[in-house]
Design a protein with these regions (language model features):
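Bacterial signal peptide processing site
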Residues: 22-24
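Metal- or metallocofactor-binding catalytic centers and their adjacent structured scaffolds
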Residues: 132-170, 203-204
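Asparagine-centered strand-capping/turn motif at beta-strand->loop junctions
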Residues: 61-75
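Short, solvent-exposed loop/turn segments enriched in Ser/Thr/Gly
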Residues: 54-61
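Bacterial N-terminal signal peptides that target proteins for export
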Residues: 1-9
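Activation targets extended, charge/polar-rich intrinsically disordered C-terminal tails
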Residues: 157-269
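Intrinsically disordered, low-complexity Pro/Gly/Ser/Thr-rich segments with frequent PxxP/GP/PP motifs
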Residues: 82-135
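C-terminal motif of bacterial Sec signal peptides marking the signal peptidase cleavage site
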Residues: 18-20
């Protein structure tokens, strides 16, 4: 019996030397797990839930490491969180969070800006433990990621038109209008929600702001639905040109005509 035990221990130690694994099959320092995109399989490694904080503008996301090693996880934009209160709004994240590092058993909480998905429902309260829909790949996610990809150019136009858009909160509010348009929100419904959440129940101010941005929001919403990059470029050119003073606009058009003429001459030579 003693001889048998010694042989077993010797075999186990030999396996550890050859493979780097202890007898129980677990490494002392498991490799870092990097999660670039969230799938159903990710649930075996990290737990992702959210807590409402009384607004549709942001949510607290709780990320917990349930694996045996260290995890690095990226949270993409467009994560869809389901409100446990069916009478209140679900939320979808407006921004991604890069590289959250978690040791075994560690949990981190990050506040993430969000968009509301249903203008007709109540504003979220403070209910905890919202589930994340890992499989959501709908039009809102695609719209957010298209905007994110071309955010620099779109923001440049918005800020040029109105310096108030230098504020990220103002830009998020503008794109929230686009999200509501994608979900068939009506003008009066949107104005009522803006008045309650953003303008201290002042419907007159909410209405004034809404009508100052709605034309651009409708046009941009149509482009985002089609994901047409060329249409976006043309729209931005037209919008930026319209912001130029009249005399500069004429000069710009003349310069463009001259460039086109010179290009034609070069081709004919």
């Amino acid at each position: 019996m003693k001889h048998s035990l010694q042989v077993s221990l010797l075999l186990a130690w030999s396996m550890f030397l050859l493979t780097g694994c202890p007898p129980n099959g677990k490494t002392e320092n498991p490799p870092i797990i990097e999660i670039e995109s969230l799938t159903e399989d990710s649930k075996k490694i990290v737990s992702i839930e959210a807590d409402g904080i009384g607004t549709f503008r942001s949510i607290q996301v709780r990320v917990s490491n349930i694996s045996e090693g260290t995890v690095k996880v990226n949270l993409p934009s467009g994560l869809y969180f389901i409100n446990p209160d069916k009478n209140s709004q679900d939320l979808i994240t407006a921004k991604g969070i890069e590289t959250i590092t978690l040791k075994k058993g560690e949990e981190k909480v990050v506040e993430v800006p969000t968009y509301c998905t249903d203008v007709n429902k109540d504003c979220p309260g403070n209910i905890k433990k919202w589930n994340c829909d890992y499989n959501y790949d709908g039009k809102l996610k695609k719209a957010i990621q298209f905007y994110e990809k071309h955010e620099e150019e779109i923001n440049a136009y918005l800020i040029k038109k109105d310096p108030a858009f230098s504020s990220e909160a103002e830009r998020l509010q503008f794109f929230q209008i686009i999200i509501w348009l994608h979900e068939d929100g009506k003008d009066d419904e949107i104005i009522a929600m803006l008045a309650r959440d953003s303008f201290g129940n002042n419907e007159s101010q909410a209405r004034s702001w809404f009508y100052s941005v709605i034309a651009d929001a409708r046009e941009l919403a149509e482009i985002i639905i089609t994901q047409d990059i060329d249409a976006l470029k043309d729209w931005l050119k037209k919008k930026m040109l319209a912001l130029l003073p009249s005399d500069r606009r004429i000069d710009d058009m003349a310069d463009r005509a001259k460039d086109n003429l010179n290009s034609l001459r070069d081709r004919l030579r």
